[in-house]
């Protein structure tokens, strides 16, 4: 039996009312964001071509090398890992024989030991590993032929075991070359070329067209990683170059045009909070917890809050991205977060203040127990089925089950906790599964959208554009590897639209 015309009318009116008031529904007010990664904070894997023009590009800041005397067949070693003599007497290389490069120019380098001291020729021809900071006597000129090196001292002599001229050649082994961030790019290119490369990158990597695309695909916010040097524009400290502040202003302009909100994310803090390239670490060290660096970071938060607090597109400020659990003490972080909260509140009562969970072996509940602030606070969790040997063993079905069986209970438990809202600030539709089908990717993405959609604040996909296509949000949407995520694609919304169509048919017939 068909639905009476009166029933069609009532159903249609209800749908029209619900559709017109849908913006007040939780599904429409939660954050559905995309990160603008690799734009104002460089990550080489996102756009590798940025590094193409660097001479000796395999010897960037932070590259770890080991040096073996060709004549003696022994490794150069900093006894005790630094702080003492330098010898060439080890048959096998380990941490004492591994040095981190500080690049001065494409031919001049400083060598840092595992304990932090630098090789120095401060005593003339006697080389030791005793300098706490580098200068002229800690700078060595490299004569290179592929992996073979001569290391020239300031006085014109060469580093050579036993000071035998035939022993001056070392074979260099690159142990790790995994830092490709802002420091490596700008210092590797030099100030003039870095200005050219980064100006072009900031202008064209993300444009207003991307903001338009996001707005048309159900995204209502962007999370924008920035580096601490943005507060010093137009004259940031070397090697960083000017322009990131103007670009952030432009992002806020586009956001206002296309109806998006902005989360400013302090991704790179002075001294580095995690030793990774995306924190602009020079050599993998984590020096952020020092009082001087924390004070400098708070100055950056003050600058950002003061500049953008009254901008209608500001949604929130994230005080620090991914502090390391192994290097940043919880007490230090909590103290910083509380002070940062007060700074933001001094300019805005409405802006959300976002606290990122420590990465590594840390319980997200630790921030809920810290009483970081009374109003509009958010804890940011980053969920990847990557970066852990556990996930390497999982097939497609097991990855999807992990989202439902492990992530869902954690999100729900945190949602119920008495404290900040929950934000899945980074996640991606990528995994370690080889040869996965498009359907499997769709199911994996669907699971994440369903589970992370339960988070009380919302979620943010990493990232808008990337050289690795499954990390690229726009590629995923255009090629239908990621389906959903927009309220316009939800079953409830489709039902409302159907009701409206029925109502229109009723009044037109």
Label each residue range with its predicted role.
Residues 20-63, 173-231, 235-238:
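N-terminal structural segment of carbohydrate-active enzymes
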Residues 458-462, 466-484:
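Extended, alpha-helix-rich binding/interface surfaces that flank or overlap catalytic cores
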Residues 4-22, 494-508:
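Cleavable N-terminal signal peptides of Sec/SRP-targeted secreted and luminal proteins
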Residues 196-220, 237-267, 279-316, 341-343:
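An active-site-proximal structural segment forming one wall of the substrate-binding cleft
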Residues 34, 76, 119, 159, ...:
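Structural signal for hydrophobic/aromatic residues that build the beta-strand cores
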Residues 57-176:
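Lectin-like carbohydrate-binding module/patch detector with strong preference for beta-trefoil
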Residues 28-30, 44, 175-178, 272-433, ...:
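Active-site region of glycoside hydrolase catalytic domains
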Residues 482-495:
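C-terminal GPI-anchoring signal of eukaryotic secretory precursors
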